[in-house]
Amino acid sequence: MLLVVIFGLVALFALWGVLRSVRNKNILGFLLAGATLFVFGWFTVMTVINSGYPTAH
């Protein structure tokens, strides 16, 4: 359960980074934050689908 929360928080911070880098016209920041958002967002979704929330034993 804690893993989903951590992945979700990282994905939210990455979303904030994407929006901030677009506003500042920072291409490298956009690419890195976008990649982080994609990876951790995918991990969050797959962890919820696989393990459920709260975690099913």
Swiss-Prot record:
Keywords: Cell membrane, Membrane, Transmembrane, Transmembrane helix. It is a multi-pass membrane protein. The chain crosses the membrane at residues 2-22, 29-49. Its main location: membrane. The keyword Membrane applies. It comes from the Bacteria. One of its GO terms (cellular component) is plasma membrane. It is found in: Cell membrane. The keyword Glycoprotein does not apply. This is Uncharacterized protein YqgW. It comes from Bacillus subtilis (strain 168). The gene is yqgW.
